[in-house]
């Protein structure tokens, strides 16, 4: 089990910038981020360039029309559950 933190970012389009400000202050190297819902629409935000482990649910990626960044990994629901269990700390930001 990883001692790093898994951040679950789920927000509406208009509240995403404030949520990203919070997580950017908490994020440490080795942490992972999962984008959920409208949060995937902020994929071009500069914060995500420093995230070495970035995920999004495959269902939510259907919201994007541009090609996916190479550092963004798609998750189905089973792998999402496994990912959550792999981290000792999981923080959900909405």
Predicted features and spans:
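Short, charged, surface-exposed secondary-structure boundary motifs
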Residues: 17-18, 63-69
């Amino acid at each position: 089990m990883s001692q790093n933190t898994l951040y679950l970012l789920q927000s509406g389009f208009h509240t995403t910038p404030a949520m990203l400000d919070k997580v950017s202050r908490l994020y440490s190297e080795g942490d992972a981020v999962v984008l959920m819902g409208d949060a995937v629409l902020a994929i071009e935000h500069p914060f995500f360039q420093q995230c070495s482990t970035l995920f999004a649910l495959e269902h939510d990626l259907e919201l994007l029309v541009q090609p996916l960044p190479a550092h963004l990994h798609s998750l189905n629901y089973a792998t999402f559950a496994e990912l959550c269990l792999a981290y000792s700390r999981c923080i959900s930001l909405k």
